Amino acid sequence: MNVHKMKILSLLMVSFISWQARAESVCPEWSEERMSGEMHLLEKQLDQWNIAYHQQGISPIADDIYDQLQDKLHRWRLCLGLPDKTDNRPIPGNGKMLHPVAHTGLKKLKDEAALISWMTGRKNLWVQPKIDGVAVTLVYQAGKLTQVLSRGNGLKGQNWADKAPFISAIPQYIASAPPLLTLQGEVFLQMEGHQQAQSGGANARASVAGALMRKSVSPLLAKLGIFIWAWPDGPKSMVEKSRLLQEMGFPLTAHYSEPVISSSDVALWRDRWFKMPLPFVTDGVVIRQENVPAGRYWQATPGNWSVAWKYPPPQQITEIKDIHFTVGRTGKITAILQVIPVKIDDKWIRRVNIGSIARWKQWDIVPGDQVTISLAGQGIPRLDKVIWRVSQRQEIVPPDADKFHQLTCFRRLPFECEPQFLSRLAWLSGTNGLDMQSVGNGLWRELIHHGFINGLLDWLSLSVEQIAAVPGIGQGRAEKIYQQFQRARQQPFSQWLQALGFPQGIPLDTSWHSLRQRSIAEWRLMPGIGQVRAKQINHFLHHPEVQMMADFLSQQGIAGFSPEE
């Protein structure tokens, strides 16, 4: 190949790489002029933070957030085809079997101050890694493993003893065991040099749970280990307990239990285990005292003899792509942030619920802003902070809150009613309503968009053929949906009332007619019902749209709605 052809090939490769980098960088849909201006402002802000950090010893933002913003600036420069001049640093990385002894759970400490408070006055304390796995009870009788119980609700769990022979880390027989031996511990996925600081959760717990709950034998069972963290009614001394556990085939307790005197000791091990290679995934540390009550006193609530100090929840920085507003069944409007997808622990985040319109206005967020998000309880995405705001503030017009309340949008039209109407249908078919199986938002949306449903009860008049006419449903599924619609007819009057939107938590009569006869004063005589609540009930019962639905249900023969009842 001659030199001229090689130059052409090189230019083509460079062009392709540049194009690919720009495509992967998720470039904002801005004009070049705006991109240049926003980039200049972000660069200026980063310089200010950098000066504060190096010259004043101040950290206005966390190091990892700073690094992520530097990376954002780097990608924006690629979008404009500019050479990179940023100094990127790598980012540091429900069962039926009774438990012999209840699983107590752990109280989670918020910070080191809470740890100091808990440690005050206690002695003989030990710290262990808080392993991210599945809690179990092992029961040995005459040395033979008889039960492997899931934690369940702490009192009862499932027996996974059939999986135990395939988990080599769990001894099937212990010659030196006492006549009855009960151990509690964590079944985990064995890892090779796992560093929590770099790799996070690695979806380990879900993998373990899946392998244990499968009816068939999973190959993953052979890769599971166990860490014993409690021996109810066992030796008082942790040293003796660890020695005996090691002799019985459970060596990890001895290897990963360290005596501590102060919170700084705990913090040292917490940091060390967070960064060093370990054979398991962790999400913090557990601090235990040697002196614990007898097993018969343990309850399915956190005991006061052990606590957890988890690692800080990981944060990610992302960009606001758009802002949507949803209207709930009762007319409540919620602001939803659509963000550039980011992965936190094992979960991809694309949307963040930030609450009411008023809350959204307090945040002062528009598309293009850079925010940090983390996972709150139960893995729910949470907006933590607005890190950087774009200079050009796009005007966002939310829905008019005055147009929506508890008695609006029982029908699809007008157009702005569709979100609340869809929420009403989802409630009606859900567990709080008529409890229809496999009938949810997706189905309702399709039926609405194909013109089969315009009112809250139109589905009662649909035939199998009409349902099957919706693209993607088909005859078989249509018949199952139709069966659910027909089964709903047999639901009791109280369920129908809740499905329609009648206020919850109120004792109900057995007929629509008798409910409508009550005055506001009579409703107020009932326990827990004040003036406001009584008026809400009265307005619902006498609303024209609601009465029309009651009349229709009477015609359909639904129990409780006939005037004679």
Curated annotation (Swiss-Prot):
<feature type="active site" description="N6-AMP-lysine intermediate">
    <location>
        <position position="130"/>
    </location>
</feature>
<comment type="similarity">
    <text>Belongs to the NAD-dependent DNA ligase family. LigB subfamily.</text>
</comment>
<dbReference type="InterPro" id="IPR004150">
    <property type="entry name" value="NAD_DNA_ligase_OB"/>
</dbReference>
<protein>
    <recommendedName>
        <fullName>DNA ligase B</fullName>
        <ecNumber>6.5.1.2</ecNumber>
    </recommendedName>
</protein>
<keyword id="KW-0234">DNA repair</keyword>
<keyword id="KW-0436">Ligase</keyword>
<keyword id="KW-0227">DNA damage</keyword>
<dbReference type="GO" id="GO:0006260">
    <property type="term" value="P:DNA replication"/>
</dbReference>
<dbReference type="InterPro" id="IPR013839">
    <property type="entry name" value="DNAligase_adenylation"/>
</dbReference>
<comment type="function">
    <text>Catalyzes the formation of phosphodiester linkages between 5'-phosphoryl and 3'-hydroxyl groups in double-stranded DNA using NAD as a coenzyme and as the energy source for the reaction.</text>
</comment>
<dbReference type="InterPro" id="IPR050326">
    <property type="entry name" value="NAD_dep_DNA_ligaseB"/>
</dbReference>
<keyword id="KW-0520">NAD</keyword>
<dbReference type="InterPro" id="IPR013840">
    <property type="entry name" value="DNAligase_N"/>
</dbReference>
<dbReference type="Pfam" id="PF03120">
    <property type="entry name" value="DNA_ligase_OB"/>
</dbReference>
<dbReference type="Pfam" id="PF01653">
    <property type="entry name" value="DNA_ligase_aden"/>
</dbReference>
<keyword id="KW-0235">DNA replication</keyword>
<dbReference type="InterPro" id="IPR012340">
    <property type="entry name" value="NA-bd_OB-fold"/>
</dbReference>
<dbReference type="InterPro" id="IPR020923">
    <property type="entry name" value="DNA_ligase_B"/>
</dbReference>
<dbReference type="GO" id="GO:0003911">
    <property type="term" value="F:DNA ligase (NAD+) activity"/>
</dbReference>
<dbReference type="InterPro" id="IPR010994">
    <property type="entry name" value="RuvA_2-like"/>
</dbReference>
<dbReference type="GO" id="GO:0006281">
    <property type="term" value="P:DNA repair"/>
</dbReference>
